[in-house]
Amino acid sequence: MAEIKNYTLNFGPQHPAAHGVLRLVLELDGEVIQRADPHIGLLHRATEKLAETKTFIQSVPYMDRLDYVSMMVNEHGYVMAIEKLLGIEVPVRAQYIRVMFDEVTRVLNHLMWIGAHALDVGAMAVFLYAFREREDLMDVYEAVSGARMHAAYYRPGGVYRDLPDAMPQYKASKIRNAKALSKMNENRQGSLLDFIDDFFTRFPKCVDEYETLLTDNRIWKQRLVGIGVVSPERALNLGMTGAMLRGSGIEWDLRKKQPYEVYDKLDFDIPVGVNGDCYDRYLVRVEEMRQSTRIVKQCIEWLRKNPGPVMIDNHKVAPPSRVGMKSNMEELIHHFKLFTEGFHVPEGEAYAAVEHPKGEFGIYLISDGANKPYRLKIRAPGYAHLSTLDEMARGHMIADAVTIIGTQDIVFGEVDR
């Protein structure tokens, strides 16, 4: 009798549900996955090596391009590692601004995740709603840094500039009449903080909308409940972090367990799952959006009451003000030196980790006393999660592989880096 062989199937890298350039080699028995072999490296851009050839400040924009859905949180880990080596303290106002933008970025990431995950499973409406909300948050990025995605807003010693007093407004054009224009600019009359405050006042209702569409939806539950189950012990052994670990019932969040910046002064909860399946991870991330809303609200309240510097007053690290640079020779020299040679970081090594929307994002930095890193190692959460795909998908149907890739929330910028 002829030997029955497993069927081998290539999934991606052009597949719409592959979230970028994932190539999976699936070994199938009928429609059941026996083995899932991820092939990575199709988006490798040598970020770690490039950083060794650039000054410390020139590598900040590279960080935006790692996980290109959670831009500012990547920068945060990098500048924190530099600050550890320099031994400098960031002004409190800058810390609050950083925390606020970390949470804005978390919401941006989770909106992209819920939209793409729902679209993969077959619910298109959520995708459209999520992108409606993302648009406002992209405008917040643009107002503060000039770029909708790659902000390069965090700097060693603080942030690039203070929050603007006016929110940019839509201008008149041929495609909008006066009535539509005034409606679009309705919540843009005040400062950037007013705009963010208005958005996060409306946002909980938007999250309720997504939950109405998905949480008790029969098809959604059939596709997610009991799929990709990971036990708490196994999740720890596999190096899972973030929502992947919390979905398995382990309460681990760097913002609470190893607080950085001003997270220890803020009031928020850590959502934790019970069953460790795709559905629990979905519920954890949805609740994270609500908790981020709470954190942003507290930051706005503090920032309104406490004006102050947003950059350290140390011209060896931070550039002088634009006005000072144009009117004072000494400050011009400092400015020129900072942006040509850069600052020298004392010899040593440091590891800084932040609670990234996808898990623990870490930067391990070694300095030999020069103006460039000797070695930069990036600990990407998605890399560890993707390596668990084989174990999570084994014994499931092909259609469930799409759900499992979606629940891992993978972006290949950081996996391949």
Swiss-Prot record:
It is a peripheral membrane protein. It comes from the Bacteria. One of its GO terms (cellular component) is plasma membrane. It is found in: Cell inner membrane. SUPFAM superfamilies: HydB/Nqo4-like. NDH-1 is composed of 14 different subunits. Subunits NuoB, C, D, E, F, and G constitute the peripheral sector of the complex. This is NADH-quinone oxidoreductase subunit D. It comes from Paraburkholderia phytofirmans (strain DSM 17436 / LMG 22146 / PsJN) (Burkholderia phytofirmans). The gene is nuoD.
